[in-house]
Amino acid sequence: MGISEVQVFLALIIALIPGILADRLGKELNK
């Protein structure tokens, strides 16, 4: 259970990082 939970947590972080970077980049471009 512990290993699978860590894998899911890492997968969520890896999935969110590009979205956060794209959001920041979009805000900078909108200026």
Curated annotation (Swiss-Prot):
One of its GO terms (cellular component) is photosystem I. The gene is psaM. Belongs to the PsaM family. It is found in: Plastid, Chloroplast thylakoid membrane. The chain crosses the membrane at residues 7-26. One of its GO terms (biological process) is photosynthesis. HAMAP family: PSI_PsaM. It is a single-pass membrane protein. NCBIfam families: PS_I_psaM. Keywords: Chloroplast, Membrane, Photosynthesis, Photosystem I, Plastid, Thylakoid, Transmembrane, Transmembrane helix. Its main location: plastid. It comes from Euglena deses. This is Photosystem I reaction center subunit XII. It comes from the Eukaryota.
